[in-house]
Amino acid sequence: MRTLALSLGLALLCLLHAKAAATVPDRSEIAGKWYVVALASNTEFFLREKDKMKMAMARISFLGEDELKVSYAVPKPNGCRKWETTFKKTSDDGEVYYSEEAKKKVEVLDTDYKSYAVIYATRVKDGRTLHMMRLYSRSPEVSPAATAIFRKLAGERNYTDEMVAMLPRQEECTVDEV
């Protein structure tokens, strides 16, 4: 009886491990071009400037198994600001990355890898810890389902509606030239 229980337990454990492994997509699926279509933050700068912000773009590429590069193109009143940041994977428990140069930790909260990703960023600047959530979409038109997921996750992190901005589309600032 004991052997049977142990065998069933091991079989169940193997089955759960196989199922979990089968549902974890290849990390490289998050690579490619993304539109930053929504933001949530409680920083003074964001709350003051959010109505002037437009949709940004990002291109994610993998440099190695545990390292990725993100190229950004963000429209500003005086032109298009572009930069790149390299992140290293810090955890096997989910997609968590850290950038030494930007002093920023990013975590993939939710994604289907095909159409949307919700990213949560934490950064320490001038002794203050700042947080921002971003909704990434593969196209400028984000699905209502992805928007609902973003708003739900924002609410779970105590962001109010005033702290969330859906960004208007723009065409002049792209990652294609980064």
Curated annotation (Swiss-Prot):
Keyword Magnesium (UniProt): no
Disulfide bonds: C80-C173
Subcellular location as annotated: Secreted
Keywords, alphabetical: Antibiotic, Antimicrobial, Disulfide bond, Immunity, Innate immunity, Iron, Secreted, Signal, Transport
Binding site residues for enterobactin: T43, K104, R123, R134
GO cellular component: extracellular region
Superkingdom of the source species: Eukaryota
Sequence positions that bind 1-tetradecanoyl-sn-glycerol 3-phosphate: Y72, K104, R134, L135, Y136
Alphabetized GO MF terms: arachidonate binding; enterobactin binding; oleic acid binding
Signal peptide start-end: 1-20
GO biological process: defense response to bacterium; innate immune response
Principal cellular location given in the protein's record: secreted
Pfam families linked: Lipocalin
Stated role: Siderocalin-like lipocalin tightly binding a variety of bacterial ferric siderophores, also binds long-chain unsaturated fatty acids such as linoleic acid, oleic acid, arachidonic acid and, with a lower affinity, long chain saturated fatty acids such as steraic acid. May act as an antibacterial factor, through dual ligand specificity, both as a siderophore-sequestrating molecule and a lysophosphatidic acid (LPA) sensor.
Self-association state and partner proteins as the record states: Monomer.
Protein family (similarity comment): Belongs to the calycin superfamily. Lipocalin family.
Protein name, UniProt field: Extracellular fatty acid-binding protein
Organism: Coturnix japonica (Japanese quail)
